[in-house]
Regions:
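Donor-binding and catalytic core of enzymes assembling or modifying cell-surface/extracellular glycoconjugates
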Residues: 1-63
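Gly/Pro- and small hydrophobic-enriched strand-loop and loop-to-helix capping segments
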Residues: 54-82
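Leloir-type glycosyltransferase catalytic cores
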Residues: 74-114
Length: 114
């Protein structure tokens, strides 16, 4: 699917050589790995909040959830919202998956890692 293509594109980028995907791992395999990461990148799910609680810098993609409810409680979370939205306008029905560009995520991730 399209998400796998985006993950592959990111993993093959200049910062991707230090990255890996959790897509095939279960929670027991994932937690020790998360704790040793420098940055979490992903949509607003439990993984974002677990990563933040473990003290990681996080880049949360708020494509279909309200930033004001889930993205502002931790200094560890940087946010990206869909094009044309504001932090206040994102909701559970934003349907913004196709309105967040790879370049925007890549550039913000690079900034957070440097």
């Amino acid at each position: 699917n399209n998400d796998k293509k985006l993950v592959e594109l990111f993993l093959n980028s200049k910062i991707g050589k230090k990255c890996f995907s959790f897509s095939e791992l279960n929670i027991n395999e994932t937690l020790p790995l998360i704790k040793n990461c420098d940055l979490y990148i992903g949509n607003d799910t439990g993984w974002l909040h677990i990563s933040s609680a473990l003290g990681l810098r996080c880049l949360g993609l708020f494509m279909d959830s309200p930033v004001m409810a889930y993205g502002k409680y931790s200094k560890n979370i940087s946010i990206i919202i869909p094009e044309g939205e504001t932090e206040e306008s994102t909701t559970h029905d934003t349907l913004g998956k196709d309105k967040i560009s790879y370049e925007k995520v890549f550039n913000k991730a690079s900034e957070l890692l440097n």
